Amino acid sequence: TWYGDAVIMDFVPATADDAKLPREPEAKVKEHAMNDLMWSAEHIAEKPAEKGRIAKGTVLSMIARFNLLWGNYSEALDAANKVIALNQYELDPDFLNMFSMSGQNSKEIICTYEHVQTTYAYGDVIRFYNNSDGGWASFVPTQNMVDMFEMADGKLIDEAGSGYDPVHPFYNRDPRLKNTVIYSGLDWIGRNGVSRIFNTLDKTLPGGSSNKDYYTAADNASHTGML
């Protein structure tokens, strides 16, 4: 786990005192989680009953991801191959399609988090945007995530011959980066459809006004300077 020892709660506590459990060793927490996932993979349906429901592909993907994080590479590979063997998923030939209405049923999507507009109309949007566009910037890209994107030639940014330029870190990168992360210098259509250049680098804008998108702005601006 990310946090080491943790509480294992595999029952519904009847009282607050019932929930006061000691932390278990990290190894036991991992074993417990993996046993639950392995059992689920054996008993869950191969296809979801409806969109947004968990099925075998989701469980196997979680097994693969957990083992990858824990350094169990052979187990991660085995689970990933089982996902492929289901013959339900494939990479979308158009990356942007997955972020459009027509891409809601893309075969690249293994599990969906469904949005019901009538019950929670703007919750997700609010979390992702800066306050200047009506958001809270609660969930923003980290520098670690951005650094994981390769160069256009497939090399990692710290790999010899990659051509990575720290002064221009977004130049000649995997095109999916630009389609995933909003960073300074990009054309941006903000609140009420007003276009501007997204700028989180300048604390003060031309004319002397305060830049609400500046990364240290207290007004719910992204603290990584990216959305």
Question: Where do the protein language model's features map onto the residues?
Answer:
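Active-site beta-strand/loop architecture of penicillin-binding DD-peptidases
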Residues: 203-227
